[in-house]
Amino acid sequence: MRRYILFSLLLIAFALSANAQMFTNKKALDKIADERKTLAENNRFKAVAMAKLKHWPMEESLKGKGYIRLVGVDENNHPRYYTTFNNSDAAATINTTSLWPGGSSGLKLNGSSANMKNKLGVWDGGRVLETHHELVGRITRMDSSYNNGGGSEHATHVTGTMIATGKNPLAKGMANGLQGILTYSISMGDDIAQVTEQSKNLLLSNHSYGDQCGWVFSNFYGAWVFMGKYGDSVDYNFGYYNRDAATLDDIAYNAPYYLRVSASGNYRDENGPAVGATYDYYDSNGVLQQGNRPDGISNNDGYQTIPTYNNAKNILTVGAIYPIKSGYTQPSDAVMSKFSSWGPTNDGRIKPDLVGDGVYVLSCVNYNDSSYDNYSGTSQAAPSITGALFLLQEYYSRLHSGNFMRAATLKGLGIHTANEAGGSPGPDYQFGWGILNNQLAAEAIKVSNSTKNATTSKHIIVEDLLTNAQTYSKTFTATGSGKLKATLSWTDPAGPVTVVDSKNKPIAELVNDLDLRIIKNGVTYYPWVLNPAVPAAAATKGDNVLDNVEQVVIDNVNKGDTYTIQVSNKGTLNGGTQAFSLLLTQPGDTALPLKLISFKATLVSNSVQLKWVTANELNTQSFTIQSSTDGNNWNDISNVNAKKTTGNNTYSVDNIAVQTGVNYYRLLIEDADGSITYSSVQTVQIPASKNMFTILPNPANAKATLLFNSDEKEVTVVLSDVMGRIVESKQLSLQTSNTYQIETSKLPAGNYYIKVSGSSGVVTRKLLVIHN
């Protein structure tokens, strides 16, 4: 009996562990929130008391480089300050513009879906200016913000980068249609408690701030201040996985659909005074002292300059590059900013995770309700990534009945589809995994859904659960030749925290060490690894024992090759299970691409005819006709299935309704694997007289209504039969009504002609009368 009870208890424990990773654990999150509230209150009280005694500044502006604010004390009773890390280019850099309404992808994503409201949050240094015309009516302020005046310029700028409507098109936010965002101020240091509470409902939140570390120039003291321990050459907080980092990982583990995005920091150009110059430092009692800078203190200008909790495993940390205004084409397009903080973490993990545009980014600010300004910093790079990833969740939800990706899937997808950056293939400690490519990520979602993750699909997205002593294994046969890439991502349990007295010694933070392998023709392919002892060295292949993201790339796979992807684990899994996300991109069929021989738009009578001729359609799924009145915003008007032959095929779609002025047309061509291309744009000019009126309905039974689309003041309407005999004639004033009704119930069935004459010309249309 005892064995059965034990077995039952093990089953219950197994189920609880699995549920914690796949469903939001509200009970655990409530406990974390309560603990963090108490901790923040006590720490804040202690810090305020010590500030009065030791003359620490409570807050100060850093002359265009953000601000710092006292939020507590650290493990050594030194003051702990939060500091902020001071959109068309940003959107182009990460390939998000194409996802917007009117964009080339045709996906029309802007965050406006009803189920996305209040699923995005921002924590920042003060209050967002809710009355700014880019944001008005969409901000929900969740706390009694520290800044109760006209708002914070930094918080307003960051929020605008995520959601500004685009009244100024150059400052349009990534999720510009989102109807509601939650905003918090970080003034009291209780942001982690607030995040814990909101993680039950949020999908993403942005955090463009972090602990002040290393060097900072204080206007309060009029001097450079070294924030590290006296006698240390490097601030131990750089790369340090502290208690807050562990808490953030715990939150993510219990809220598996919530992803926190954080800025990496701007410390590489905060270098302190010259050697021998006067500087301030904190002694062992936390009292500020003054001395001459010794030779050995670091300039913070290289690797391992990301502070404390921004080194957490389960968050997404973002660095800053210069904008790529015309869009990415090659790795050298990515130019590193002078300030963006680099990895690795103390235990050698890859940070930052991704990079985005953070140099001279235009967004709204709080000067007045229509003001804008350009800021630089990882603070500006992070919100563009946050807003872009939010659109991926919107798209996934559309295709999956309102359900969302797990955060590990979203993070893994962003990394998997990122554009290469840096001097060598693979990840590095400067650019992380590269530049977010939001269009390719959206394509992966579309293709994996349309193919139901078939083994022949170009893109596959899998969410699964691994148990102890189990190996996930799946075999594929390549349908084409080229590069194969697989990415494994998982939300790892919180790692161990060490309290340190000096620059901390490395300790591995990875708890559940999963392994990704690809086996082809008896050869095992390993993931990328970096060497933290030589941080500038290029990535190599090997056993990654540090990161909770692994990626295997095979540069050359031949059509017909069989390969097996395996996911396993070392040792014993914490809790007995580990949820994971697997992303795969494999080369597709090598059949010849579609050849679009011609595409023409012609005005026929009073409507447009579109005709196109193709060849090599074997891989083509369909053609969607799109129209536009401005050449930017496109609407689907008709869909035609491809004939899927190698010979020439001719297509024609007639009677396309038109509007006065220039009408634009193009073809959206979808391949079998879900990838999309576009034809050239064709235009048709419609004079005002050609579009004078429309007949609804046509054919007509009892009544036919003429709808006038003209600026004419008066027109004459003549109805005649096929013999030219006038059935009805009427002079109309369009100043009182733009419609006219013809009774057709008493007319014999057949064809009739309606002629409308006005000052701009004469238009005749055919009317068909039928009687049911």
Residue ranges with predicted function:
Residues 21-24, 91-205, 210-222, 253-259, ...:
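Subtilisin-like serine protease catalytic core
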Residues 641-665, 732-759:
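Short, surface-exposed loop/turn motifs with a glycine/proline- and acidic-biased composition
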